[in-house]
Amino acid sequence: MSFSDLDFHYQDTSSPIEIEVELSDIPHELLSERKFGLYVINDLTDDKCQESNLRIIIKLSVNESLEPRWVVKARPESDIEDKVISAQERALFAINFITDYTDNQFAYNKISPLYSFTKSSLGDSKPIDKIKSKMLRTMSASLGNDDMAELNRPLAKLKTTVEQLGLSIGELSTGIDIKENPYTGNSIALHERSDCMELPFRLHGKGSKRLMSIAIQMELAQTGGIALIDEIEQGLEPDRIATLVRLFRKMDKGQMFITTHSMNVILEAEANNLFVLNKGEDSLFQVDCDMDNCRRSNPQAFFGKKLIVCEGKTECGFLRALDMDIEKKYDANFSTKGVVIVNANGGDKIYTYAIKLKNLGYDVCVFADNDVSEELSKSMDAARQSSIPLFLCNKGNCLEKEIIMSISWDAFISLIKCDEEGFPNKNIELSDDLIKEITDAVSDEDKKNIRELILQKAIQKRHEWFKHIPGGEFLGMIVLNDFKNIPDGNNLKINLVKLKKWCGFGQD
């Protein structure tokens, strides 16, 4: 493992990198007094303490010399020094890292997980070493299937595991990969037999190789190892991602550490399996089990930086229109600033979600109606106490009322002429008499009465005009196209100006 100045916090090499990990399931070979038996941190007077529960602390430190130093830390009350742990000893923990570069993991070199898996299954590395020695003497041409038979024994189990992950393959076998230097362990590699052909597994596609690599790591983890998987979703279809996470959850041995930017992983995992790491933070935030509903309905929330929690589909659509308007004016959008819309689907979940997400380290605000404020007053107060900005309609108003009573008369006429294109249902019906009344309206009082009449029709239960995302987008476009005509002191206009600024976009 190599380091550079870029690995240090703010590239300050005067502050060393220090990482400590507490490990259990310690390989038996490391528990002798000659090794690290005296460094176990458990209470050794406890007769009930089993070997699998014994724990040690391994510390990695890197100073300005950029040389990594690995030690096992001494017990706090002991008089012994920290002890260096070698790469060979660390390898016994079977920690492996899965990335996009997996080709070398299908060869039997000593640093590959396939080598570790075979050695673990056979209980000995001699069969592999024996083949290497023979190859050095006679080269690859002298090796036939009989020579590889013993290495093929563990591959039946590996085939079962990889098929559980959703990969359909032929028979697996160990063969000579003629690409590699025949004098190295890389020339003995995993192959697949199909249609009378035998091809090195490294020639498979990215997704297939990744699944095979994960299957090998899973088998190793079953012996108490640790697997690190970066961006698990890379090269995999959504159904396979879900299958992988489900199988990981069933594992009762070993450990799997996964990083992801996939909503499919968030959906399939359980809340207590999820930890959030925010940029600039030095600790992880564990997702609360109470967040299950939010996790299932808004998995995208966990990948944002700034979250707008809104009440329902109308608000979501309205914010989408705001995002499109921002893109036209600033050549940037919500994604540029890491802004994500979260639909709480009404009730006090708006404020519950907002507070929980705030506690996970996200920057959060609320954009919602204010027509049932008495019922939600305690939740609102809790959100304010958590320093969450609330961009709410005037007291007693839903978003539709706030808009209909705020826009200019010309914009109002455009609103009632909505053609409902793309709407999931079409509920806008105006009688000829009402259309004439609207056309003939002159006084402010007449126009106000008409606005209130249209509002009641627009929010009528089970016949709502805009209670869906396309409806919200339409309302958003009406408001934003009429923005300059709305008075500066209007609550809707004030909220939109503040919300844009909160998102990171200046005032027009």
Question: PLM ranges: what are they?
Answer:
Residues 1, 183-301, 491-495, 501-508:
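Switch/communication elements of ASCE P-loop NTPase nucleotide-binding domains
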Residues 83-156, 403-410, 417-419:
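Coupling/switch segment of ABC-type P-loop NTPase heads
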